From Swiss-Prot:
Lineage: Bacteria, Pseudomonadati, Pseudomonadota, Alphaproteobacteria, Rhodobacterales
Protein name, per record: Cytochrome c-type cyt cy
Name of the encoding gene: cycY
Database matches in PANTHER family: CYTOCHROME C
Region (Disordered): 69-93
Short name of one Pfam family: Cytochrom_C
Compartments reported by the entry: Cell membrane
One term of GO molecular function: heme binding
Modifications made to the protein after synthesis: Binds 1 heme c group covalently per subunit.
Protein backbone atom coordinates (compact mmCIF):
# COMPACT_ATOMS: atom_id res chain seq x y z
CA UNK A 1 0.00 0.00 0.00
CA UNK A 2 2.86 2.34 0.84
CA UNK A 3 4.48 1.69 -2.54
CA UNK A 4 1.19 2.34 -4.33
CA UNK A 5 0.75 5.68 -2.51
CA UNK A 6 4.33 6.63 -3.27
CA UNK A 7 3.89 5.81 -6.99
CA UNK A 8 0.65 7.82 -7.07
CA UNK A 9 2.40 10.86 -5.54
CA UNK A 10 5.22 10.59 -8.08
CA UNK A 11 2.69 10.34 -10.91
CA UNK A 12 0.76 13.39 -9.69
CA UNK A 13 4.02 15.33 -9.30
CA UNK A 14 5.17 14.40 -12.81
CA UNK A 15 1.77 15.35 -14.21
CA UNK A 16 1.91 18.73 -12.42
CA UNK A 17 5.43 19.38 -13.72
CA UNK A 18 4.42 18.45 -17.28
CA UNK A 19 1.32 20.66 -17.01
CA UNK A 20 3.43 23.56 -15.71
CA UNK A 21 6.01 23.27 -18.50
CA UNK A 22 3.26 22.88 -21.09
CA UNK A 23 1.64 26.06 -19.83
CA UNK A 24 4.97 27.91 -19.98
CA UNK A 25 5.58 26.61 -23.52
CA UNK A 26 2.14 27.72 -24.72
CA UNK A 27 2.47 31.09 -23.01
CA UNK A 28 5.90 31.76 -24.51
CA UNK A 29 4.68 30.80 -27.99
CA UNK A 30 1.68 33.09 -27.75
CA UNK A 31 3.76 35.98 -26.44
CA UNK A 32 6.81 35.70 -28.64
CA UNK A 33 6.02 33.66 -31.75
CA UNK A 34 3.71 36.26 -33.29
CA UNK A 35 6.12 39.15 -33.02
CA UNK A 36 8.40 39.88 -35.95
CA UNK A 37 12.12 39.67 -35.41
CA UNK A 38 13.66 43.09 -35.03
CA UNK A 39 17.15 44.46 -35.10
CA UNK A 40 18.32 47.86 -34.01
CA UNK A 41 20.64 49.74 -36.32
CA UNK A 42 23.38 51.71 -34.58
CA UNK A 43 24.87 54.90 -35.98
CA UNK A 44 28.53 55.88 -36.03
CA UNK A 45 28.04 57.69 -32.72
CA UNK A 46 26.83 54.48 -31.06
CA UNK A 47 23.23 55.68 -30.68
CA UNK A 48 20.31 53.56 -31.83
CA UNK A 49 18.74 54.61 -35.12
CA UNK A 50 14.97 54.57 -35.19
CA UNK A 51 13.45 52.21 -37.76
CA UNK A 52 11.29 53.66 -40.46
CA UNK A 53 7.65 52.71 -40.73
CA UNK A 54 6.28 51.36 -43.98
CA UNK A 55 2.92 53.10 -44.11
CA UNK A 56 1.69 50.72 -46.81
CA UNK A 57 2.05 47.80 -44.39
CA UNK A 58 0.00 49.51 -41.68
CA UNK A 59 -3.59 48.30 -41.22
CA UNK A 60 -6.26 50.55 -42.65
CA UNK A 61 -7.87 52.95 -40.21
CA UNK A 62 -11.44 52.28 -39.17
CA UNK A 63 -13.96 54.52 -40.92
CA UNK A 64 -15.09 57.49 -38.86
CA UNK A 65 -18.64 57.78 -37.59
CA UNK A 66 -21.09 59.72 -39.72
CA UNK A 67 -20.28 63.43 -39.61
CA UNK A 68 -22.91 66.11 -38.92
CA UNK A 69 -24.45 67.74 -41.98
CA UNK A 70 -22.44 70.99 -41.61
CA UNK A 71 -19.13 69.13 -41.62
CA UNK A 72 -20.25 67.03 -44.57
CA UNK A 73 -21.09 70.18 -46.56
CA UNK A 74 -17.62 71.59 -45.86
CA UNK A 75 -16.02 68.36 -47.00
CA UNK A 76 -18.07 68.41 -50.19
CA UNK A 77 -16.78 71.88 -51.10
CA UNK A 78 -14.22 71.80 -53.89
CA UNK A 79 -10.67 71.56 -52.62
CA UNK A 80 -8.02 74.04 -53.62
CA UNK A 81 -6.19 72.93 -56.73
CA UNK A 82 -3.02 70.98 -56.03
CA UNK A 83 0.25 72.80 -56.49
CA UNK A 84 1.96 71.97 -59.77
CA UNK A 85 4.80 69.47 -59.46
CA UNK A 86 8.30 70.92 -59.34
CA UNK A 87 10.36 70.90 -62.52
CA UNK A 88 12.42 67.76 -63.08
CA UNK A 89 15.59 69.85 -62.69
CA UNK A 90 16.42 73.39 -61.69
CA UNK A 91 19.64 75.04 -62.69
CA UNK A 92 21.96 75.72 -59.77
CA UNK A 93 24.27 78.71 -59.63
CA UNK A 94 27.81 77.29 -59.30
CA UNK A 95 28.63 80.18 -56.94
CA UNK A 96 26.33 78.59 -54.35
CA UNK A 97 28.57 75.49 -54.24
CA UNK A 98 31.26 76.43 -51.73
CA UNK A 99 32.72 73.13 -50.55
CA UNK A 100 35.77 71.12 -51.57
CA UNK A 101 34.65 68.35 -53.96
CA UNK A 102 37.73 66.18 -53.27
CA UNK A 103 37.11 66.26 -49.50
CA UNK A 104 33.43 65.69 -50.24
CA UNK A 105 34.24 62.56 -52.25
CA UNK A 106 36.22 61.18 -49.31
CA UNK A 107 33.36 61.94 -46.89
CA UNK A 108 30.82 60.45 -49.32
CA UNK A 109 32.84 57.24 -49.57
CA UNK A 110 32.96 56.96 -45.76
CA UNK A 111 29.37 57.88 -44.91
CA UNK A 112 27.07 57.67 -47.93
CA UNK A 113 28.41 55.05 -50.34
CA UNK A 114 27.07 52.06 -48.40
CA UNK A 115 23.50 53.04 -49.33
CA UNK A 116 23.81 55.43 -52.30
CA UNK A 117 25.52 54.60 -55.59
CA UNK A 118 26.87 56.99 -58.19
CA UNK A 119 26.72 54.65 -61.18
CA UNK A 120 23.07 55.36 -62.01
CA UNK A 121 21.86 52.25 -60.16
CA UNK A 122 19.70 52.25 -57.04
CA UNK A 123 20.77 50.46 -53.89
CA UNK A 124 19.36 50.77 -50.37
CA UNK A 125 18.86 54.42 -51.27
CA UNK A 126 18.37 56.03 -54.68
CA UNK A 127 21.41 56.70 -56.86
CA UNK A 128 22.76 60.22 -56.53
CA UNK A 129 23.77 60.95 -60.11
CA UNK A 130 22.48 64.42 -60.92
CA UNK A 131 20.93 64.91 -57.49
CA UNK A 132 21.82 68.61 -57.35
CA UNK A 133 18.82 70.43 -58.83
CA UNK A 134 16.74 67.25 -59.29
CA UNK A 135 13.15 67.10 -58.04
CA UNK A 136 12.81 65.14 -54.81
CA UNK A 137 11.63 61.53 -54.88
CA UNK A 138 11.93 61.19 -58.67
CA UNK A 139 14.62 58.57 -59.28
CA UNK A 140 13.02 55.99 -61.53
CA UNK A 141 12.70 52.52 -60.05
CA UNK A 142 13.24 53.56 -56.42
CA UNK A 143 10.39 53.08 -53.94
CA UNK A 144 10.24 56.23 -51.81
CA UNK A 145 8.45 56.56 -48.48
CA UNK A 146 5.24 58.56 -48.44
CA UNK A 147 7.03 61.16 -46.33
CA UNK A 148 9.69 61.68 -49.00
CA UNK A 149 7.09 61.77 -51.79
CA UNK A 150 5.36 64.57 -49.86
CA UNK A 151 8.64 66.49 -49.48
CA UNK A 152 8.02 68.32 -52.74
CA UNK A 153 10.66 70.53 -54.30
CA UNK A 154 14.13 70.29 -55.78
CA UNK A 155 17.44 69.32 -54.21
CA UNK A 156 19.14 72.69 -54.29
CA UNK A 157 22.41 73.05 -52.35
CA UNK A 158 20.55 74.97 -49.65
CA UNK A 159 17.84 72.35 -49.33
CA UNK A 160 20.34 69.47 -49.29
CA UNK A 161 22.32 71.28 -46.60
CA UNK A 162 19.24 71.49 -44.36
CA UNK A 163 18.29 67.86 -45.07
CA UNK A 164 21.75 66.46 -44.41
CA UNK A 165 21.91 67.99 -40.92
CA UNK A 166 19.30 65.42 -39.81
CA UNK A 167 17.24 63.63 -42.48
CA UNK A 168 14.71 62.23 -39.99
CA UNK A 169 14.14 65.65 -38.43
CA UNK A 170 13.72 67.36 -41.81
CA UNK A 171 11.48 64.63 -43.29
CA UNK A 172 9.83 62.68 -40.46
CA UNK A 173 8.95 59.22 -41.75
CA UNK A 174 11.77 58.98 -44.28
CA UNK A 175 13.25 55.52 -44.80
CA UNK A 176 16.75 57.02 -44.67
CA UNK A 177 18.30 55.84 -41.41
CA UNK A 178 21.42 58.03 -41.65
CA UNK A 179 21.74 60.29 -38.59
CA UNK A 180 23.12 63.23 -40.55
CA UNK A 181 26.23 65.35 -41.00
CA UNK A 182 26.39 67.84 -38.12
CA UNK A 183 29.48 69.67 -39.45
CA UNK A 184 28.67 72.41 -41.97
CA UNK A 185 32.01 71.91 -43.75
CA UNK A 186 31.29 68.20 -44.27
CA UNK A 187 27.88 69.00 -45.76
CA UNK A 188 29.32 71.68 -48.04
CA UNK A 189 32.04 69.30 -49.23
CA UNK A 190 29.63 66.42 -49.92
CA UNK A 191 27.30 68.78 -51.81
CA UNK A 192 30.26 70.05 -53.87
CA UNK A 193 31.15 66.44 -54.71
CA UNK A 194 27.56 65.55 -55.62
CA UNK A 195 27.52 68.56 -57.95
CA UNK A 196 30.37 66.97 -59.97
CA UNK A 197 28.31 63.85 -60.75
CA UNK A 198 26.64 63.60 -64.17
CA UNK A 199 22.87 63.51 -64.53
Amino acid sequence: MLVKTHITKIGVTLFAVALFYGFIYMLSNSLFATRPATAVAVGADGKALLPSVDEAAMPAKAPAAAAPAAETAEAAAPAEPAAPPPPAYVEVDPATITGDAKAGEEKFNKTCKACHKIDGKNAVGPHLNGVIGRATATVEGFKYSTAMKNHVGNWTPERLDIYLVSPKAEVPGTKMSFVGLPEAADRANVIAYLNTLPR
